[in-house]
């Protein structure tokens, strides 16, 4: 609009200087209209091409019908609000855990707000140790939240089974929890209910335990300059500052300290016969290492617990500093990541050659890479990502990309002696500009999966059809201008303005994209 106003102003100025064009004639009107339309097209094109892509943009309250899309297999668990059902996608065959929440139990306004806030937070969070939300929909009786199946069960059950953990295993677990919390706090999100019941193990593989933080019902956005006041949480894990009604994001660190204490000893630092007694002990902040279980625990481990359980939030260690604590670095320094070399070679090739500037193709691939892949399909890529993520915060910055890229080339068997740092940096900068789809200066986990995965794996008919249906909201068999505008958050625009944007894909020039055009676009991209 600013450009259009400027154009009209310039023409008025020309008239004032004696340039007596007759804008009242039909030719003048048409010329101005054509120029205005041209500018509008350019604005739409620029807005579209500069739009930021995030996995959360694909999670919308859709019109999916549960029994048409999914087949329920068995109940995985029950809670006060509903149940979790192991379900199979009828189109792709993939299995998901679907949380089914009865609307009878979400009658209060605050309960519905809590549910919708949880969905919004999960839409924005993209981290290897945070549960992934695939879909959210509702019908007359229920809300449905679709996520991965984490077959390893709760960390709580693993604690009961093991009694207590070796230091190295406890460090591996708490490092992942802190990685997720560091990422959350960096994005101004506080969990407020961290406990072993809300930490799931991705698989039953005890050698390579990957954890997932779940249940964001009590989570919220926070501001560093403001204290929170809601007294919420679970007795054993709640921080004293929460009980006092004035706290910040470091309430999560207190909970991590309690979890680490339990992992190493098998018992909570603040115990009691009932909730009242437990909370009274939490309020004092006093605990002890004078237990038989702690006699063989290192001073460094105890030091981290002490720093996490500092009574005053201002002097309590931050998530970032806890993640970099000497004990965690020492315990996890020898963790070897065995990377499959063929997978590594393919991922490096895919990363280097990802140069698509077609925003629709990028969006389709991001959806397929982040929402239509399974844990097994991304297992090797997850290892590569973790190896590159040197500071463990779940994102790759420029420096990590430079170091990690060189390491991966060596692992692949390439001779890097002739590659100077400047050449590596140039290549990394090109990679970063190509695959940083949300333009935040980091490579998120889903962005990495999207560009590194075997794209031919993604292009099954079932996956292509599901991706197409995401864009084709009205089920007409074609993706319209307004459907794209909705998805990219650009508002209603005229179809004419979108023809310029879509011309690379729209082969028959009808102003819409059919399935064949959509499929051809992705096949062309994957053939480099």
From Swiss-Prot:
Residue span(s) of domain EF-hand: 376-411, 423-458, 459-494, 498-528
Protein name per the record: Calcium-dependent protein kinase 4
Phenotypic effect of disruption: Host hepatocyte invasion is reduced in knockout sporozoites; the few intracellular parasites develop and egress normally. In infected mice, formation of schizonts and merozoite invasion of host erythrocytes are normal. In a PKG T622Q mutant background, reduces ring formation and thus the number of schizonts. In addition, merozoites have a discontinuous inner membrane complex. Impaired exflagellation of male gametocytes which fails to assemble the mitotic spindle and are arrested at the first round of DNA replication.
Motif (J domain autoinhibitory motif): 350-358
Broad class of where this protein is predominantly found: cytoplasm
Organism: Plasmodium berghei (strain Anka)
Motif J domain EF-hand interaction motif: where in chain: 359-368
Catalytic reactions of this protein: L-seryl-[protein] + ATP = O-phospho-L-seryl-[protein] + ADP + H(+); L-threonyl-[protein] + ATP = O-phospho-L-threonyl-[protein] + ADP + H(+)
Record-linked Pfam families: EF-hand_7, Pkinase
SUPFAM superfamilies in alphabetical order: EF-hand, Protein kinase-like (PK-like)
Entry keyword set: ATP-binding, Calcium, Chromosome, Cytoplasm, Developmental protein, Differentiation, Kinase, Lipoprotein, Magnesium, Membrane, Metal-binding, Myristate, Nucleotide-binding, Phosphoprotein, Repeat, Serine/threonine-protein kinase, Transferase
Top-level taxonomic group: Eukaryota
